[in-house]
Amino acid sequence: MVTKAKIPLFLFLSALFLALVCSSLALETEDLSNELNPHHDPESHRWEFQQCQERCQHEERGQRQAQQCQRRCEEQLREREREREREEIVDPREPRKQYEQCRETCEKQDPRQQPQCERRCERQFQEQQERERRERRRGRDDDDKENPRDPREQYRQCEEHCRRQGQGQRQQQQCQSRCEERFEEEQRRQEERERRRGRDNDDEENPRDPREQYRQCQEHCRRQGQGQRQQQQCQSRCEERLEEEQRKQEERERRRGRDEDDQNPRDPEQRYEQCQQQCERQRRGQEQQLCRRRCEQQRQQEERERQRGRDRQDPQQQYHRCQRRCQTQEQSPERQRQCQQRCERQYKEQQGREWGPDQASPRRESRGREEEQQRHNPYYFHSQGLRSRHESGEGEVKYLERFTERTELLRGIENYRVVILEANPNTFVLPYHKDAESVIVVTRGRATLTFVSQERRESFNLEYGDVIRVPAGATEYVINQDSNERLEMVKLLQPVNNPGQFREYYAAGAQSTESYLRVFSNDILVAALNTPRDRLERFFDQQEQREGVIIRASQEKLRALSQHAMSAGQRPWGRRSSGGPISLKSQRSSYSNQFGQFFEACPEEHRQLQEMDVLVNYAEIKRGAMMVPHYNSKATVVVYVVEGTGRFEMACPHDVSSQSYEYKGRREQEEEESSTGQFQKVTARLARGDIFVIPAGHPIAITASQNENLRLVGFGINGKNNQRNFLAGQNNIINQLEREAKELSFNMPREEIEEIFERQVESYFVPMERQSRRGQGRDHPLASILDFAGFF
């Protein structure tokens, strides 16, 4: 009987223990329900869920009970999330009241967790306010049309809110991204409102400068402090907006009838006044000063053209511009050909209007033929065709178009570019490096060039006629310490990345050029330079106050930069040295007499030129003289006119008419197979700043005008072991032929042939008057030589 009584007692005690456990769990569930506030944001719910799970692990001893506790935590989390969503959709409460309740909840928590909890409350409050503002804006489109808010001000406030939160870097970037998205959305809405309100008319009167918008957009991208990929995406959006704004501005200008002004130019003084007024209306600060300088330069250029007889628009230049537009705007070869034919018709029609049907004369016809030949000359580049890359009041950097943009005949040198630097006295060119090898010639003034690599820094004083090579990737900077003379440097570049394409990377920026350091995110720069962010911002902002990459400097600083530089003839020490500059004037004269002189630096003699395989030469032809017909065996020479005027004539085996500017594939093969040995005379008048190309094997003669000497600088591509063969003068190659070879070749008695080729007593350079003294029935002194060019 006693044993049977113990069993009910055990069952009673077990039931009592289970009841106590269930009661305890119910209380815990109620506490959890109170702690998981449905009005917290998702991050708060997740944090509290983690706290709940930790309590389950610490307070529940059995594994099964701990799992049950964790499942209850998960159910509570899901329920609170559903309640929060229902309240946001159906019955949202006043944000201020929610914020106060959230703060009260934070005060009940662990003091160590209170700051983080309060920041979450603050963020939730701001987001709810923003949602309400968006809802109000949806119902106030009409009001917004009348009084739109400035998106930039909204963006500034959003950024300030992100900074006040004091979150980690990742949360900061996410917040910045949301600000960016809102900013873009507001901008699109504002543009739509402006279009609906017809603000295009106002924009025609006071248009915003697209370049200023682009600069602000870039500055905004830099302030974000995002990663490199996000920075690039932001920069791409800025470029797209710039292109769109420029198209809109061009459309506005066309509607204002500016095309008529371009076709019928008014008085230059009126154009100058209009240019100045436009600067006053559209520019501010330093950009306004730059705009005024451009107006002044334009007026001076027009004055020079009037003095040279170019007060009316040159049909030839219009034709070249039309041809370039065809090549850049039309994609298919067929459409390019049709476009070029339209250019041809317009050119002929304009010539007919200028000359008139009854005004033909032998002199005008001769001039017309000469202009026609020059217009179809793919080897000649007018100085006005150079494109400006960096321009300021202190100087300019110009570059020639890619050689294959004009014609496929120059494919052999398509990986070379020509760049010209012009700098005023007492100026400094900001440091930069480029992805191209370069050979530089000083064609005016004096300079100090410094380039820096990882191992060393080298500085050289350069004078007129000095040549120096700068390796790809070396950071270089130039000064013009002369107080009176302008500096001019001509460069031949060989890009190392993409054929025919090069880029300049400036270490220090300006208004028109960005420093490559600015593209890096703030955290990268702060860590790499060990400098606070605010100092870096001042560092970059200070640079952008400058107008361009060529700036004025004090004489004291310029002297300090040049005092340790070496000059031509001094050999720098070190195996990795560049080798220093070469003085063309100090080279042994290759050809010289009283009518001209020719100096040349070859890669066989100068290791500085060996890697690029380029020769550099300087020629001075006295006025009224000629460099006799000759050709180069291997080198294709790019010639720059340093000073003077003149002309050249060249024998060319290709059809250089406008219909034959494109030499591709089968057409080239057909031309080679059907070649009849006929040559065309390619000619052009030369003036300072012009560029022309002499392909290897092409006989050419160059003459100086009767008024001034002609000075030329040439870069010979594939210059190693090049030979220059003269076709006239005492040292011509015809005199070296055997007697029988002369008679068989020219079908004349040997005596008559020798009388022709040995008649000239001078070599290399000859006077034009002496060539035509006896007169042999030729219209031009070069005719007797160039007629033979077809044989060679």
UniProtKB/Swiss-Prot annotation:
* Compositionally biased spans, kind Low complexity: 315-325
Q: Which residues form a coiled coil?
A: 727-754
| Record SUPFAM superfamilies | RmlC-like cupins
Single biological process term from Gene Ontology: protein homotrimerization
Q: Which UniProt keywords apply?
A: Allergen, Coiled coil, Copper, Metal-binding, Seed storage protein, Signal, Storage protein
Q: Where is the Cupin type-1 domain?
A: 384-537, 582-754
**CDD domains associated with the record:** cupin_7S_vicilin-like_C, cupin_7S_vicilin-like_N
Q: What residues does the record give for site: Cleavage? A: D311, R312
The entry's note on the tissues where this protein occurs is:
Expressed in seed (at protein level). Expressed in seed.
UniProt lists the family membership as follows: Belongs to the 7S seed storage protein family.
Subunit structure, briefly?
Homotrimer.
What this protein is called in its record is Vicilin Car i 2.0101
Question: What is the organism field in this record?
Answer: Carya illinoinensis
The top of its lineage is: Eukaryota, Viridiplantae, Streptophyta, Embryophyta, Tracheophyta
Gene that encodes it = pec2a1a
